[in-house]
Amino acid sequence: MKKDFLSITDLSAEEYEDILTLAARLKRQRYAGVPHPLLAGKTLAMIFEKASTRTRMSFDVGMYDLGGYALYLNAKDTQLGRGETVADTARVMSRYVHGAIMRTYKHETITEFAKYASIPVINALSDKEHPCQIMADSLTLKEKFGELDGLKIAWIGDGNNVCNSLIMASVQTGMEIAVGTPKGYEPDPAAVKFAKENGGKVTIYDDPVRAVSDAHAIYTDTWISMGEEDIKETKLKDFVGYQLDTALLNKAADDALVLHCLPAHRGEEITDEVIDSMQSGVWDQAENRLHAQKAILVRLMTQGY
């Protein structure tokens, strides 16, 4: 039976740890120049409604590393953009390829596609979640701290899709998530509810200083997501005081790790001094998209579960 990765909640704690372990092994093999064609003869469809740098490159290069082939499809250039149903598209693509990723505006598009696809489907970003990003983040944190359990991660800024996935990942990882966000920009209540009902530790503050207190890592993201350009000025005003600068970083634990899933709007949500500092894990985090996603692809496309 096929397994999809639409939400971070699709993984058990054991599966979560297994993917991180495999990702670390694949990373070592890549650095050592050891071939690992675990997906030889496999083709991945990459369906994009939203533009991307890291997502497209990491999946494309990842499939090449694994001996497979990645087929890029801009949704507007397919029959999806001309009115063909998601269900019919999923049925047809399932006859051509061995797996699919989707980067889309609406989470419902991915769940609908997965419902009718007979191949594994991976959420490469939706308005509700970004689970692949959180796996890369978890690999980065594990490399830095050794274990995830007991870490305090402070999220500063908009309670967006990445924040939702991070909150729900507290269940599998044992990480404590502290969110500092202005009122009206809180994460999805359903994500918070899920975490708290399943043993996760999550606290929401409207004060960034309280959120970062004793944090092992501080995570931020752009305040203005794609499609929100019309409310940019409003959000810039609302997020005054939530910039990750040196003063806020100094309120966290000593040598706290700085995370940002990129692209960064320097001078808005984060300063040059912080993102380029010795405490920045941002570039390792970006690289780890490649390794974490390769592990996800292997596990799903070889029926590893």
Swiss-Prot record:
Record-linked InterPro entries: Asp/Orn_carbamoyltranf_P-bd, Asp/Orn_carbamoylTrfase, Asp/Orn_carbamoylTrfase_sf, Asp_carbamoyltransf_Asp/Orn-bd, Orn/put_carbamltrans, OTCase_ArgI
Binding site for carbamoyl phosphate: 52-55, 79, 103, 130-133, 261-262, 289
Pathway entry: Amino-acid biosynthesis; L-arginine biosynthesis; L-arginine from L-ornithine and carbamoyl phosphate: step 1/3
Keywords, in A-Z order: Amino-acid biosynthesis, Arginine biosynthesis, Cytoplasm, Transferase
Annotated Gene3D superfamilies: Aspartate/ornithine carbamoyltransferase (3.40.50.1370)
Broad class of the protein's primary localization: cytoplasm
Entry GO terms, CC: cytoplasm
EC number from the UniProt entry: 2.1.3.3
Reaction catalysis annotation: carbamoyl phosphate + L-ornithine = L-citrulline + phosphate + H(+)
Entry's localization field: Cytoplasm
Any GO MF annotation of the entry: amino acid binding
Gene Ontology biological-process annotations: arginine biosynthetic process via ornithine; citrulline biosynthetic process; L-arginine biosynthetic process
Family of this protein: Belongs to the aspartate/ornithine carbamoyltransferase superfamily. OTCase family.
PANTHER family: ORNITHINE CARBAMOYLTRANSFERASE, MITOCHONDRIAL, ORNITHINE TRANSCARBAMYLASE, MITOCHONDRIAL
Function in brief: Reversibly catalyzes the transfer of the carbamoyl group from carbamoyl phosphate (CP) to the N(epsilon) atom of ornithine (ORN) to produce L-citrulline.
NCBIfam families assigned to the protein according to its UniProt record, in alphabetical order: orni_carb_tr, PRK00779.1
Protein name, per record: Ornithine carbamoyltransferase
Source species: Methanocorpusculum labreanum (strain ATCC 43576 / DSM 4855 / Z)
